[in-house]
């Protein structure tokens, strides 16, 4: 970085330079280096040329062009005094409003005082006859935009580093009350040390942006509130910062694929710009903070510096980063990042493999302790166990061993079923108690269970990530597999309930088996051991001989009590053995498992049956008859159980004699032989035989004559006997019919067969689906073409109707077979001749959208839009509106709904359906539609207007004219609110940011309608006011309509609305800028029928709340700077009191704007700086001289200097009439030589008469103020400034005197500039009357000082 120089451009010429040296030679010397030649060659390729010498830049030599913008170019330059390389931004004066030039020069003087490592230093300015040259610090490595253009996209880490520095610079600017307004990659410059600097702040906001509502500059980075002309704030810079992040990450800003106007439209309409797909969650969160739509909710730069992404990127809490990223490292990281983006996916695959190695799956963890030789009953059990196993964190637990002696295989298999309880008595209370007692549970106290903080509790339970896990697979053992399998295998004839008492108990710990040396090793049971067999075999419980079964049951009943005691004893011994071992390491595991077993036992016993309670005598009878067991395998025979009923004679309990007679209940009397029934059965059999024969004769090999006879006979039989439908289906007649339809060309055969098909499938979705599956849809759809007769097409339409209204499946198959094209073809028929076909098409398309299937409606819209379906549909709408009746209204509603669905589809569909002919036809028929359907169609138009690419089609179809007329005609109808809601939204979308459409709406009379809506309809006010306020930004035609409808007075009345006062004041300022003289005159008028502009401004500033007060200061200070006469009317105590209360606002931007407003009022007043003392603001402004914000400090100091200068000269004590007297002493020669007023020369007597006439009036008329203010004010953009308005008595002399006084007042503000004649050359265009007046005043001041 080159060192900064504090020397201004007014430094003396260097002695080594030859004043008359040609510019070309100097350029040659500057361009001798290789880098300079390369830059020069690049500039030549880009069409850039070096700047011409500017005579006023006497201390600088311009070099090559670094870049071009909308308002000027930036050149590299060399300071001849210091050798420092600087950047010079040349702005053409012709591109600047004259009212802004002086403000820009004043602001540069303020911005020179700003100094921060992350902002570009302003060094001054030099004004020439054609350009304004702003001298800036030079950053040698260019912008981030150029780096991204040369090297590709930035990685997130580097963007975070750069954004950290940008936020530091932005925070400094915001603390100083400066809004950047144009943050983007091209305005973020870099140095070789990796330091980034914000450029083009302050002055950039004056020279770029929206000029007369046209897009100039960089719209892709603009915040929504800036586009909507609501005023830029510090939050607007945060939005632009988010767009810059996307620009660096993606290489392009948001919406870069769109033209500027559509991009602006999308920025305002979308919730937020599209986020980069590959961005990390932290970056996406950062962007969402930046893209808050409401600027009041948007985060500040100070808070963004604390965002995790920025903190992680910088890892520093200091205000200025201590060590910056080197430029070469930054470029290298960008190159490596883009190479990684372009590389194949092998790296990603390698990374994935490495992650798998770091986190091995659970299968490896389970098999790590498994020996190589394992004997299992079945390989399926191991696969299942491994598949659903969970990873073990430390030691492997095996619940199977915990239940080794508790649960026998027989306990896990269901016992046999018995008829009376469906469980065969094997799950009675005693049997359940016996099974429950086998788990070896010992009753433990609750205190032992409730000892928490068990580190192994989670290992005993299934993990949350593996909900299917229940019992882990046991570690295998190298043991005598044959022995253990013979003892415990699942294939034994009888599964033992538990091991004998002398069997060693072998618990599991840490995946290793602890063996008893005196006992044989027992192999662990696989999970399949406890799996219930799908084929139920209960041969161990049920014997072929019932005597054996009875003995077993009696034995079970006798030994139940002893078994329970024995099992309990064994379970206690098991628990004691396990507890004695586990006390060393994990004493809580056994207790926890035992308590869980105990709780399971209690729960099972709650639901156990009691055989003593099994008394069904109330159902089976009091005799206690016992049922014999069925001999079947399943043991369940529903017919063996009969309820006890009152009809005992027919009951099986009372009538044992008929038990062996299976036909006892069928002893009904048979009727005598019915002759008629026999004839009917015989006729039906012959009919069936006939139909089957006809169906069998339907072959493609038959002659067409024969096929014609067969089809006619079949149709006749089917019409006479509809029940033959099932016969045709059972005879597989559908396929032969389809084959003949596909090949036959005789239309009579086709018609007969189509009628048969429609009759068969009518209202039978199963047959329809079968027909679809065998390919019937495309065959029958073929007959819907226009080449076939009307009768055949009607049958095809009937088939189509069945397809789209029966089921979702048939609809999907109909669409997949090209059915939508058939519907569109029906729509294209003539409504008069083929009304039925057209209505089938309308109802078909409506049914397609109404059926709730899996296919999105957008897909249907896209398919139909390819066929331009809305064109014939709009024609049908016109014909339907000509009819009356319920059917016509239903069809009208369905057509409106179809249009509305198309407007909700994707943008591509909207563009395809927005044809001028369709829109024109729809808009034409709007008035004839019923109110409900009219609102639906207006929603269709509104949705189309939300897409920028459809606005031209809407304009070409006279949408604004039709909608304005419809709004006018429905203003007194009950549905006006709903209609106006849609219309105002549409007109707002169309007129926003487009002058031609704004003028079109104004010419169609939208302005008085909107004004009426604002006064009467409160909810609709929010839709009408944006359109009205935008009218001030339109051209001459729109403003002419505003003048005709008192638009300026309407804007003034809006200043009392806290929600719209900022927008209204901005509209007044824009209007004043366009038509300065006329608007100023009306603003200065005092009328009895409306409040004055001055009173409205004072009331607005006095009553406005916090946010509204901050936002209104920016347009107000612009307006006062543009019109000093208006500013002079605001020198009021109540206004200064309110400004004094806000001078110590927390935001530097508010304090700075307040000081600017006070400065504008003081400059326009006769008392100048004396107003500060008069209204008690002097002390408050003195305190601001020590403000932390540099610009506030500097502005306050200049105001204090103005006040002190005014006091020293005593101007505040001079009366206004004394000053007028001195003005009248100007010699006639000087007056004759003045060239400011273009008025005829009058005699001295007329001048004197005018002077005395004006002197008699203590307050000059406002019209005279307005006229005098025009002398040195820039003309409006509509044309040259009108002539000077004369005084009240029509004399020009009084006007001329007021001109001189206005000039003196305005010249006093020049003193705020540095008193350097070199800084502002004499080439500044001023009227000749200014210089004599200024010299005379200076002499008068010198005399007073002496």
Swiss-Prot record:
Transmembrane segments: none annotated. Gene3D superfamilies: Leucine-rich Repeat Variant (1.25.10.10), Transferase(Phosphotransferase) domain 1 (1.10.510.10). InterPro entries: ARM-like (IPR011989), ARM-type_fold (IPR016024), Kinase-like_dom_sf (IPR011009), Prot_kinase_dom (IPR000719), Protein_kinase_ATP_BS (IPR017441), Ser/Thr_kinase_AS (IPR008271), Ser_Thr_kinase (IPR053235). Pfam families: Pkinase. It catalyses: L-seryl-[protein] + ATP = O-phospho-L-seryl-[protein] + ADP + H(+); L-threonyl-[protein] + ATP = O-phospho-L-threonyl-[protein] + ADP + H(+). Residues 1-50, 342-380, 446-497, 1211-1295 are annotated as: Disordered. One of its GO terms (molecular function) is ATP binding. The active site is at 182 (proton acceptor). This is Cytokinesis protein sepH. It comes from Emericella nidulans (strain FGSC A4 / ATCC 38163 / CBS 112.46 / NRRL 194 / M139) (Aspergillus nidulans).
């Amino acid at each position: 970085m080159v060192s900064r120089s504090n020397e201004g451009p007014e430094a003396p010429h260097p002695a080594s330079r030859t004043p008359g040296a040609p510019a070309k030679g100097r350029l040659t010397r500057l361009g001798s280096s290789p880098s300079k030649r390369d830059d020069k060659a690049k500039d030549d390729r880009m069409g850039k040329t070096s700047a011409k010498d500017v005579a006023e830049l006497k201390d600088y030599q311009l070099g090559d062009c670094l870049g071009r913008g909308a308002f000027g170019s930036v050149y590299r330059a060399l300071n001849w005094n210091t050798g420092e390389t600087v950047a010079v931004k040349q702005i053409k004066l012709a591109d600047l409003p004259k009212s802004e030039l002086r403000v820009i020069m004043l602001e540069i003087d303020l911005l020179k005082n700003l100094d921060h490592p992350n902002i570009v230093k302003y060094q001054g300015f030099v004004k020439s006859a054609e350009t304004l040259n702003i001298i800036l610090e030079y950053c040698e490595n260019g912008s981030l935009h150029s780096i991204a253009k040369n090297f590709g996209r930035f990685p997130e880490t580097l963007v975070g580093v750069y954004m950290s520095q940008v936020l530091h610079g932005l925070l400094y600017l915001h603390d100083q009350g400066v809004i950047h307004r144009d943050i983007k990659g091209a305005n973020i410059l870099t140095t070789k040390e990796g330091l980034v600097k914000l450029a083009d702040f302050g002055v950039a906001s004056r020279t770029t942006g929206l000029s007369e509502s046209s897009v100039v500059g960089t719209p892709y980075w603009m915040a929504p509130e800036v586009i909507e002309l609501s005023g830029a704030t510090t939050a607007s810079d945060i939005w632009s910062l988010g767009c810059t992040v996307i620009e660096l990450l993606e290489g392009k800003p948001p919406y870069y694929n769109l033209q500027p106007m559509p991009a602006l439209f999308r920025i305002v309409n979308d919730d937020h710009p599209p986020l980069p797909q590959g961005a990390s969650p932290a970056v996406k969160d950062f962007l969402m903070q930046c893209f808050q739509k409401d600027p009041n909710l948007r985060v500040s730069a100070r808070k963004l510096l604390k965002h995790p992404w920025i903190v992680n990127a910088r890892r520093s809490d200091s205000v200025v980063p201590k060590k910056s990223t080197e430029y070469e490292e930054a470029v290298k990281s960008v190159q490596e990042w883009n190479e990684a983006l372009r590389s194949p996916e092998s790296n990603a695959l390698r990374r994935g493999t490495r992650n798998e190695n770091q986190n091995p799956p659970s299968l490896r963890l389970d098999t790590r302790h498994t020996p190589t030789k394992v004997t299992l009953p079945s390989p399926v059990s191991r696969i299942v166990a491994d598949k659903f196993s969970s990873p073990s964190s430390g030691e492997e637990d095996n619940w199977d061993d915990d239940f080794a002696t508790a649960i026998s295989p027989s306990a896990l298999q269901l016992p046999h079923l018995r008829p009376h309880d469906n469980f065969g008595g094997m799950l009675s209370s005693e049997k359940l108690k016996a099974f429950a007692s086998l788990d070896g549970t010992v009753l433990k106290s609750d205190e032992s269970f409730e000892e928490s903080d068990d580190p192994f509790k989670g290992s005993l339970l299934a993990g949350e990530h593996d909900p299917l896990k229940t019992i882990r697979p046991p570690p295998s053992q190298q043991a005598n597999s044959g022995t253990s399998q013979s003892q415990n295998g699942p294939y034994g004839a009888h599964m033992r309930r538990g091991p004998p008492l002398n069997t060693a108990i072998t618990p599991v710990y840490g995946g290793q088996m602890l063996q008893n040396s005196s006992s044989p090793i027992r192999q662990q049971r696989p999970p399949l051991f406890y799996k219930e067999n799908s084929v139920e075999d209960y041969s161990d419980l049920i014997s072929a001989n019932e005597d054996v079964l009875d003995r077993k049951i009696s034995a079970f009943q006798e030994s139940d009590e002893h078994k329970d005691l024995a099992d309990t004893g064994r379970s206690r011994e098991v628990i004691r053995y396990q507890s004695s071992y586990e006390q060393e390491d994990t004493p809580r595991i056994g207790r926890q498992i035992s308590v869980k077993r105990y709780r399971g036992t209690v729960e099972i016993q709650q639901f156990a049956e009691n055989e003593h309670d099994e008394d069904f005598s109330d159902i089976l009878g009091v005799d206690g008859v016992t049922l014999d067991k069925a001999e079947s395998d399943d043991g369940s025979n529903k017919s063996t159980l009969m309820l006890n009923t009152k009809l005992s004679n027919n009951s099986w309990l009372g009538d044992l004699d008929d038990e062996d007679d299976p036909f006892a209940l069928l002893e009904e009397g048979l009727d005598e032989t019915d002759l008629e029934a026999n004839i009917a059965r015989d006729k039906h059999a012959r009919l069936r035989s006939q139909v089957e024969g006809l169906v069998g004769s339907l072959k493609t090999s038959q002659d067409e004559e024969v096929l014609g006879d067969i089809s006619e006979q079949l149709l006749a039989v089917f019409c006479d006997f509809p029940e033959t439908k099932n016969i045709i289906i059972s005879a597989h007649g559908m396929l032969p019919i389809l084959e003949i339809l596909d090949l036959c060309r005789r239309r009579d055969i086709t018609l007969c067969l189509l009628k048969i098909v429609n009759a068969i499938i009518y209202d039978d979705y199963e047959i329809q689906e079968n027909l679809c599956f065998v390919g019937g849809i495309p065959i029958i759809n073929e007959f819907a073409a226009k080449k076939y007769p009307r009768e055949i097409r009607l049958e095809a339409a009937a088939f189509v109707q069945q397809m789209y209204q029966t089921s979702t499946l048939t609809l999907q198959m109909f669409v997949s077979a090209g059915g939508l094209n058939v519907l569109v073809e029906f729509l294209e028929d003539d409504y008069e001749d083929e009304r039925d076909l057209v209505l089938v098409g309308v109802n078909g398309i409506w049914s397609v959208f109404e059926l709730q299937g899996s296919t999105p409606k957008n897909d249907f819209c896209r398919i139909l839009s390819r066929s331009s379906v809305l064109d014939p549909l709009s024609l049908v709408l016109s014909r339907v509106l000509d009819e009356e009746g319920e059917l016509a209204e239903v069809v009208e509603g369905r057509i409106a709904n179809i249009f509305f669905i198309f407007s909700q589809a994707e943008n591509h569909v909207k563009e395809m359906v927005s044809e001028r002919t369709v829109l024109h036809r729809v808009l034409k028929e709007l008035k004839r539609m019923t109110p409900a359907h009219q609102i639906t169609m207006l929603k269709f138009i509104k949705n189309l207007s939300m897409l920028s690419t459809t606005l031209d089609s809407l304009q070409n179809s006279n949408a604004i004219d039709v909608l304005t007329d419809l709004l006018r005609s429905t203003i007194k109808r009950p549905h006006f609110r709903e209609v106006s809601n849609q219309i105002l939204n549409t007109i707002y979308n169309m007129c926003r940011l487009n002058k031609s459409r704004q003028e079109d709406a104004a010419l169609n009379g939208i302005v008085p309608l909107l004004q009426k809506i604002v006064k009467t309809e409160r909810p609709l006010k929010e839709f009408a006011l944006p359109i009205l306020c935008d009218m001030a930004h339109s051209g001459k035609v729109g403003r002419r309509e505003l003048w005709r409808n008192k638009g300026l007075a309407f804007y003034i009345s809006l200043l009392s609305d806290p929600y719209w006062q900022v927008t209204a004041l901005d509209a007044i300022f824009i209007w004043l800028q366009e038509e300065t003289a006329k608007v100023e005159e009306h603003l200065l008028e005092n009328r009895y029928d409306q409040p004055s502009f001055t009173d409205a401004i004072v009331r607005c500033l006095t009553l406005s709340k916090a946010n509204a007060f901050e936002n209104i200061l920016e347009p107000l200070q612009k307006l006062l700077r543009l019109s000093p006469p208006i500013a002079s009317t605001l020198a009021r105590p109540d206004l200064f009191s309110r400004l004094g209360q806000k001078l110590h606002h927390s935001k530097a931007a508010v304090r700075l704007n307040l000081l600017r407003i006070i400065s504008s009022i003081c400059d326009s007043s006769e008392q100048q700086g004396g107003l500060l003392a008069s209204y008690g603001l002097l002390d408050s402004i003195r305190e601001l001289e020590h403000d932390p914000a540099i610009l506030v400090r500097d502005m306050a100091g200049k105001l204090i200097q103005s006040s002190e200068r005014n006091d020293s000269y005593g101007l505040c004590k001079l009366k206004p009439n004394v000053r007028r007297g001195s003005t009248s002493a100007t010699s006639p020669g000087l007056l004759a030589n003045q060239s400011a007023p273009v008025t005829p020369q009058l005699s001295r007597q007329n001048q004197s008469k005018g002077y005395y006439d004006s002197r008699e009036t203590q307050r000059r008329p406002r019209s005279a103020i307005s006229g005098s203010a025009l002398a040195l004010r820039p003309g409006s953009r509509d044309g040259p400034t009108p002539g000077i308005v004369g005084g009240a008595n029509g004399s020009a002399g009084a006007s001329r005197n007021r001109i001189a006084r206005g000039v003196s007042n305005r010249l006093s503000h020049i003193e705020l500039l540095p008193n350097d004649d070199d800084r502002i050359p004499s080439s500044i265009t001023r009227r000749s009357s200014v210089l004599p007046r200024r010299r005379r005043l200076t002499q008068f001041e010198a005399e007073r000082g002496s």
